[in-house]
Amino acid sequence: MQTPTGRLLELLELLQERPLTTGREIADRLAIDARTVRRYVEALQGLGIPVEGQRGVGGGYRVRPGFRL
């Protein structure tokens, strides 16, 4: 079983690999529920990582273009 920290790192890698990732794709990839996706996104934002969310059809999450660790 992966730790929450490991899943946060995996989420960051996923967001940096793709221009836009839906909450469902994140949940499926990390084997978590939608609420946990939102909590993890908030955790990354709290660490100063510029994760942006777009609602609605065609929406999803992304790291602001140009950001790299």
Label the predicted regions:
Residues 1-69:
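Short, basic/aromatic recognition patches that contact phosphate-bearing ligands
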